[in-house]
Swiss-Prot record:
InterPro entries for this protein: CRESS_DNA_REP, Gemini_AL1_MSV, Gemini_AL1_REP, Gemini_AL1_REP_central, P-loop_NTPase
Notes on the domains: There are 3 rolling circle replication (RCR) motifs. RCR-2 is probably involved in metal coordination. RCR-3 is required for phosphodiester bond cleavage for initiation of RCR.
Protein name per Swiss-Prot or TrEMBL: Replication-associated protein
Organism whose genome encodes this protein: Maize streak virus genotype A (isolate Nigeria)
Superkingdom of the source species: Viruses
CRESS-DNA virus Rep endonuclease domain: residues covered: 11-114
Hydrolase as UniProt keyword: yes
Keywords: ATP-binding, Covalent protein-DNA linkage, DNA replication, DNA-binding, Endonuclease, Helicase, Host nucleus, Hydrolase, Metal-binding, Multifunctional enzyme, Nuclease, Nucleotide-binding, Nucleotidyltransferase, Repressor, Transferase
Amino acid sequence: MASSSSNRQFSHRNANTFLTYPKCPENPEIACQMIWELVVRWIPKYILCAREAHKDGSLHLHALLQTEKPVRISDSRFFDINGFHPNIQSAKSVNRVRDYILKEPLAVFERGTFIPRKSPFLGKSDSEVKEKKPSKDEIMRDIISHATSKEEYLSMIQKELPFDWSTKLQYFEYSANKLFPEIQEEFTNPHPPSSPDLLCNESINDWLQPNIFQSSDERSRKQSLYIVGPTRTGKSTWARSLGVHNYWQNNVDWSSYNEDAIYNIVDDIPFKFCPCWKQLVGCQRDFIVNPKYGKKKKVQKKSKPTIILANSDEDWMKEMTPGQLEYFEANCIIYIMSPGEKWYSPPELPPTEAVHSDRS
């Protein structure tokens, strides 16, 4: 089942990291060594730790970390040391962060060689003379190293390379999506768990077991599910509550496709506007798609079922040719809803309310 967490997943990506451990009395040297070991895979170059005192006398710890490769983490507890949890930030101006840390320390420890922040894309530090204009490669290298989000990355390019930004925006958006992939918010069912109130629940259960809940041989081919019926009957909520999935509504966007998803959902998209419908319905493997603002790519390394949801006025089968309909019926379980059916069970009334309802 999908996670119940409604918070967006934590993400940090930067070669310069600023850590603050509130109410932490750790020795700066010990803290430095522990943090250094945590980031070995990203090739640490420099770390500075300083212990300071709050006005109330309690101690806290600041740390500036610089690595050759950007630190990429999605666990907010990654930098925890001895039970102390830090505030994790990207150090956009390492010179200022270092000056701030060294302002009033009680104890300090450094390891490695500090890498001063260069003046904006000049290839020279603030104290050095500006001798020559940087190349585009140098500018982009600096942007990639210091940008902390997709929006900041594109904004920095627009500022430093305005002509390239205006003529090659599609390619910069593609690289931005690669550097800062979108973290999809996990679906949370807004309603209490319940079973579908259907006339033929058995056919749905027979489809769920082999296609969603049971692992199968990688060589086997899954089967999709097509549900057509009225709005406000819980189709989308039921489909989205089954597990990790790719969800498309209004249009199919391949740019954020998740290979780890168990299944796909096509929700309220007219048949004529669904690209690769045969590949999705047929649970095919390794087919080519063309993401918006990106290059063509191969997706779906293993057979993956698709749940197609449609209202009666957008019934896919009414738009298909005889040949298309034959393919659809061969690769898809079709469930046409009857009047009164819902994909959730009505809440049970308390005994007193139930008696009153019967009398009325």
